């Protein structure tokens, strides 16, 4: 699935407060007929984003890696030896983080990621290049992992249309499908983390999560841009 804002690397170092800053501000000049104003603003913001710079320095696939790092720093979700499924894995930052923290290796892979977009190989990660919404996807994920997961993570977001309510509804649908999958495969005591957009229509999703998990949290990590409507739902301690 495509990601809003570019997505998802490592140890828990480099989390909260670790993005750094620079006094150098890059401005993108607009030449007539070459670039839309909205595209120019996005590119300028991207070039001046401290998380983008830090992700390159730290060797993470994307700035979204810090979102998972920061959430994990707060809730201690990832532990050595766990098995993880990453939905909408491209470009691989969340799988990268998960594999390093849980100790996944090529000889004993404990992380499986899926995306219809190509993801370059990652150490310790099995990557499936297919749409999670395909009927065969859930079974292929379970076959690849070989056991029930301890954690299902999803940074999926539908391609944006520019219409806020439409984008919200499409992403909530992905969250609902991911949640249905999680409650059908998680180990008792497992956790589910998914991206959603603020918009007030996720009542059914929240009701499902509150029924199936012992606690549900709304989380906005510091790496999420302040102006972004993205939000994360964390459902902890699956009742089984």
Swiss-Prot record:
GO terms for cellular component: cytoplasm. It is found in: Cytoplasm. The active site is at 195 (proton acceptor). This is Ribosomal RNA large subunit methyltransferase E. Residues 1-20 have a biased composition (Gly residues). Its EC number is 2.1.1.166. Residues 1-33 are annotated as: Disordered.
